[in-house]
Amino acid sequence: MKYVLLIYQGTTPLPGSERWKTQSEAEQKQIFADYAQLNQTPGMTPGLPLGLPDAARTVQVVDGKVHVKNGPYQAEGAGGYGVYECENMEAAIALAARIPAARLGGAIEIRPAEQYW
């Protein structure tokens, strides 16, 4: 089964941010190493890192008219994603727990990938 993992950064220190600068060099290297190791996990297809939420645009069409709003649709925008093909939800949860954002102030949302058409 395929699962989509949505990575919500929350207060996770992001490279280039003030919070990132509070991490030691060893902590920064460990975070990068953890992500690199996750990307090598069999069945894992990493997505591209997403830009910061303030760079997002949200598009809706209401009564045929296009509406564009600055920022993410939800207050806490996603910072990344991946697709993990594994046996079951428990395996997806185990992988999600290894994502640095899960322990550094963020959260990982897991959804089964469905094919409707």
Could you say what each language-model-derived stretch is?
Residues 1-117:
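Conserved, structured core segments of small domains
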